[in-house]
Amino acid sequence: MKALILVGGFGTRLRPLTLSWPKPLVEFCNKAMILHQIEALVKAGVKDIVLAVNYRPEVMVSVLKKTEEEFGINIHFSVETEPLGTAGPLALAREILGKDDSPFFVLNSDVTCVYPFEAFRDFHIAHKCEGSIMVTKVAEPSAYGVVVTKPNSTVIDRFVEKPVEFVGNRINAGIYIFNPSVLDRIELRPTSIEKEIFPAIAADQQLHSFDLQGFWMDVGQPKDFLAGTCLYLSHLTSQHSPLLTDPSQNKWVYGGNVMVDPSAEIDPTAVIGPNVVIGPDAKIGPGVRLQRCVIMSNATVRDHSWIANSIVGWNSTVGRWTRVENITVLGDDVTIKDELYVNGASVLPHKSISTSITEPRIVM
């Protein structure tokens, strides 16, 4: 099988992290976001993966070369000279996606879930229609586009954008399977798969919905990145995953859902958790309190500091007796001096902060 991952452009929603790395290479729970998806696709038998990119493809090529060799797959880079939306990239990659009669996956690179690609593939093959959309249930469907199926059927009847009245609670999860025939519907121009292609396939009664079981989150912006981290860690806990740090062996773990890279240095008087990820070679000092946060590789949190609901970027340093909270995001190589309060700041790379930031703002 084949797959196309919609990588897209500048990743502006996840700045300042994406000022240093393309969004798919930003670590989500200590692994590049795109590697979570590639590994799951390989398990479903995918051999050819197309990455539709229009920002810094050369960085991704060098990083993912090892991934190709490790999994014995072919990773193709389809580079857009202009943004082509969510459907145009399929036309651009027609030569690979349409090279045989087998169906292909399409997925948004921002989505994290359990990735049930094998079950999704089997569902698609069984109904013998042109396309399948993975859907997930949400509590507030009025904020999304809702997928409405025919009664007692998986056949999609229509799509309702941000409904005022309740018509259903299933939304597009950003993961699809198509037969190559769908390529005949798509021109090589900026095109929306959601607004232009899906309604046409649904009108022909050739589009089905597949219910995603378990968690789902679009992690393309900081608050959702943190929420998705919590969901993913909770999933690992439910699976008794060895990727999580064992509280019985590490007394500084509090409340569970903690993932710490083995190379990180944690002072035994620190209190970490719940819902914390600490990356490679990070250093956590005495008396530090971490909760619902991500500390990326080579970052340092000095003595008696408190970090909650925030992301500390690569190579950054948080000084002693400092409080960081409220969706603060520190870019690469940021320094926060001692005894400061940082509230909801987005700090661009290589900045040094020497005064408190009491209200959310961007520090350039």
Swiss-Prot record:
What InterPro entries does the record tag this protein with? Answer: GMPPB_C, GMPPB_N, Hexapep_transf_CS, Mannose-1P_guanyltransferase, NTP_transferase_dom, Nucleotide-diphossugar_trans
This enzyme catalyses: alpha-D-mannose 1-phosphate + GTP + H(+) = GDP-alpha-D-mannose + diphosphate
According to the UniProt entry, its GO molecular function terms are: GTP binding; mannose-1-phosphate guanylyltransferase (GTP) activity
- One Pfam entry for this protein is GMPPB_C
Metabolic or biological pathway, per its Swiss-Prot or TrEMBL entry:
Nucleotide-sugar biosynthesis; GDP-alpha-D-mannose biosynthesis; GDP-alpha-D-mannose from alpha-D-mannose 1-phosphate (GTP route): step 1/1
Q: Which organism is it from?
A: Cryptococcus neoformans var. neoformans serotype D (strain JEC21 / ATCC MYA-565) (Filobasidiella neoformans)
The role this protein plays is:
Involved in cell wall synthesis where it is required for glycosylation. Involved in cell cycle progression through cell-size checkpoint.
User: What's a GO cellular component annotated to this UniProt protein?
Assistant: cytoplasm
Going by the record, the broad EC class of this enzyme is transferase
The record's listing under Gene3D superfamilies reads: Hexapeptide repeat proteins, Spore Coat Polysaccharide Biosynthesis Protein SpsA, Chain A
Predominant location:
cytoplasm
Q: Name one GO biological process term.
A: cell wall mannoprotein biosynthetic process
Q: Which family does it belong to?
A: Belongs to the transferase hexapeptide repeat family.
Where in the cell is the protein located?
A: Cytoplasm
Q: Highest taxon of the source? A: Eukaryota
Protein name as catalogued:
Mannose-1-phosphate guanyltransferase
Q: Which CDD domains match?
A: LbH_M1P_guanylylT_C (cd05824), M1P_guanylylT_B_like_N (cd06425)
- Is Ribonucleoprotein a UniProt keyword of this protein? no
Q: What is its EC number?
A: 2.7.7.13
- What are the UniProt keywords, alphabetically? Cell cycle, Cytoplasm, GTP-binding, Nucleotide-binding, Nucleotidyltransferase, Transferase
